[in-house]
């Protein structure tokens, strides 16, 4: 498939009128020949799916074949530019998992090893037998923190490590799955600090060993020098859309202060900890399960490397084969004690494609984010995909804008 330098179709598609996007908004960017359906789906999202502003990028077998952006990036209706970045919430989890995959390829980490081998203090409170694989599959029973944790604790990695080490699993590790909405990244971060010879934070490692190597704008620790003018602000769904869009059971769980998902996502520290009213997003703070900020281009490029052999990041084939392998269930099955369903499966820090929520081939791995963001690698098709948006949707999985783009992509590939 030819890349953009070998014959690019420039997309200057006027968006149709809609509530979310004024008619003057333009979709910018390009698609390589044969990928026109993706451009059309991106434009239609503004008219059909209340898109406000966003971007979509696709790498195919190492070549960038789709790079689109459009709409507006804030309530002042300033345009979404080529280099606009936005927080991607839990799509960050896939980026964090990439850091551990790089560490695995370097021989620093064994997914089957007990975490306490690398981090001895972790062994207390019945955590001595938890393996790296179990943690990354949300099977460690550590989905919530039992003591107050705020931005000050998160910013002090040594202090945070002490808090993490003294947590008690909610049940016997390896028996159940429960979405570690925010805690997963904290545990990953300390694990990486223990195995990295330079003891870098997860955000620093990602920046130096992945984002900078690829020349892309994606951050797990947003630096001070990034101006607000490069950042898109999130537009939440209306109260009516939230009431009608979220599954009733999920709404009830989110409102119940004793529920697992409330404890995992709403408090201690809560998903709003990385939002800053004056600076859009908190700077120099790492919440590796949710505070990633970047472009669709950066996300797609990183996944594209994982989908096409990993040469740029010196990934071993053994690592890539493990990421593509099926998820291993806990002893009680894939029913998730936080999300109250069994349609989602995790493996080695990534979400896996399942019949209940498919993306790409069965060997694909990636991570969606609250509101609609998505990134994944499909090693069978050689696809690295990234989609980001400022208009938050209400679907827990399978945002219709993302689905429309992926359907158009695989239609273009005739897969």
Question: What are these language model-derived features?
Answer:
Residues 5-8:
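Low-acidity, Ser/Thr- and Arg-rich intrinsically disordered low-complexity segments
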Residues 27-88, 110-113:
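Short, conserved catalytic-motif segment at the N-terminal edge
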Residues 36, 42-43, 62, 84-113, ...:
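Active-site SXXK
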Residues 81-83, 167-174, 185-189, 279-288:
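Flexible glycine/proline-enriched surface loops and loop-helix/loop-strand junctions
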Residues 82, 87-91, 105-147, 165-166, ...:
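Active-site helix/loop module of the DD-peptidase/beta-lactamase fold
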Residues 138, 183-191, 290-311, 373-390:
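Active-site-proximal alpha-helical segments within enzyme catalytic domains
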Residues 236-296, 325-380, 415:
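Active-site Gly/Thr loop motif
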Residues 308-311, 324-335, 395-415:
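Short, gly/Ser/Thr-rich active-site loops of penicillin-recognizing serine hydrolases
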